[in-house]
């Protein structure tokens, strides 16, 4: 009976870290807009601030709470950068919504083909 040998190559932290870089808070802070990608969808304004709720972990976010609650289920109070996107959080750091990097900003794909919420920086 032949013996099957499986070799697993593990990447070092250095190699993985070089492929996904954590964006700086200062590079992402500012005015943003959220919108469901359907015709006539309301635009929700949100500001990603560079003032920490929890140092080096969660930063303040504020915006149109009614609009954000309707769109996301609850209005985010915080945010944090991730190597592959932006996480909007409540005040304790629990996830409200995750937006992955996309060609024209950041996107959150809703379940059951309900659409895609797009997060875009407001051009100043």
UniProtKB/Swiss-Prot annotation:
Keyword list, A-Z: Disulfide bond, Metalloenzyme inhibitor, Metalloprotease inhibitor, Periplasm, Protease inhibitor, Signal
A single cellular component GO annotation: periplasmic space
Domain of life of the source: Bacteria
Described purpose of this protein according to its UniProt entry: Inhibitor of the alkaline protease.
Disulfide bridge partners, by residue number: 44-67
Signal peptide: 1-17
Entries under InterPro entries matching the protein: Inh (IPR022815), Inh/Omp19 (IPR021140), Protease_inh_b-brl_dom (IPR016085)
Phylogenetic lineage: Bacteria, Pseudomonadati, Pseudomonadota, Gammaproteobacteria, Enterobacterales
Molecular function as annotated in GO: metalloendopeptidase inhibitor activity
A Pfam family of this chain: Inh
Protein family according to the UniProt entry: Belongs to the protease inhibitor I38 family.
Name of this protein: Alkaline proteinase inhibitor
Origin species: Yersinia ruckeri
Entry's localization field: Periplasm
């Amino acid at each position: 009976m032949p013996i099957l040998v499986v070799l697993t190559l593990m990447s070092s932290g250095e190699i993985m870290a070089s492929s996904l870089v954590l964006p700086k808070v200062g590079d992402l802070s500012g005015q943003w807009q959220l919108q469901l990608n359907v015709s006539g969808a309301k635009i929700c304004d949100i500001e990603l601030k560079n003032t920490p709720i929890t140092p080096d972990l969660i930063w303040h976010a504020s915006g149109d709470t009614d609009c954000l609650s309707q769109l996301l289920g609850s209005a985010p109070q915080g945010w944090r950068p991730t190597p592959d996107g932006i996480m909007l959080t409540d005040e304790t750091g629990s996830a409200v919504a995750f937006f992955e990097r996309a060609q024209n900003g950041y996107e959150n794909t809703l379940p059951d083909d309900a659409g895609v919420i797009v997060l875009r920086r407001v051009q100043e």
